[in-house]
Amino acid sequence: MAAMVRYALAGNGEPALKAVLRPGEAREMNDRSQPEFAPVGDRQYHHFRIDVPKGVGKMTIDLKGFARAADFDLHLFANRTGFAWREDAAWGHVGEKTDKRLVIPDPKPGTYYISVFCATTVTASMGKYGVEYSGRTDVLNGVPYTIQVNFE
């Protein structure tokens, strides 16, 4: 029941971080029973944070979809001044499919925000018995992915 309430509130109010990422550690977002590890839903953002120390020559952010989710469209964004929304992110990789990579050369030390956005969505229309969904309805189960940040 608690998970249902948390999912119902997702997308309402202030955005929340899914996690603070650690360099070199892949984070799997594929557990529907735990919201902090849940796949991303249609038109939703997942927000992460990472702290970059002094002396990092390059930061690479890799987003990889699971094989069963490879034909969904995920976008990847990064920002230093706050959440990485598509409209104001300093770095971004958009396009078809799930796998994306951002390379940030000579990142300044400090906090960086990383966001994953699911651009795949359904079509909703009024039918005889209410709202009917068509198109990519499989996205309603969420799109599983792995995100990893590496420093060089």
Predicted regions: what they are:
Residues G127-V131:
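Short, surface-exposed terminal/edge motifs of secreted or surface/virion proteins that either
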